[in-house]
């Protein structure tokens, strides 16, 4: 049996552009893609902290160092510049591998600079 797990995430990215007329997808700074391990054209889930929208699209590479997060095409209706979002990619692993797997977690500031990385989400206190 394969289990679907969080592969990686960009936590609290700031949307810099929202381009309705662009050909779909989400353009992400190439350095951020590399840090998270997200490949161009890989399916991603985007969770908009500002408005609660959750949607699926795919990643495309924006210029490295640009700090761009551009939500494009129809998805542009779901995010505006300045919105904070969580961008996740998932993978499937056999149960035995899943038990040992740790995701790549990349935490960003409001300017889409990496402030820290990790591989475990802390236990949530009651």
UniProtKB/Swiss-Prot annotation:
InterPro entries: Asp_de-COase-like_dom_sf, Asp_decarbox
Catalysed transformations (reactions): L-aspartate + H(+) = beta-alanine + CO2
Pathway as given in its UniProt record: Cofactor biosynthesis; (R)-pantothenate biosynthesis; beta-alanine from L-aspartate: step 1/1
Residues holding substrate: 57, 73-75
Active site annotation, chain numbering: 25 (schiff-base intermediate with substrate), 58 (proton donor)
GO BP field: alanine biosynthetic process; pantothenate biosynthetic process
NCBIfam families, alphabetized: panD
Subunit structure: Heterooctamer of four alpha and four beta subunits.
Name of the protein described by the UniProt record: Aspartate 1-decarboxylase
Source organism of the structure: Thioalkalivibrio sulfidiphilus (strain HL-EbGR7)
Gene: panD
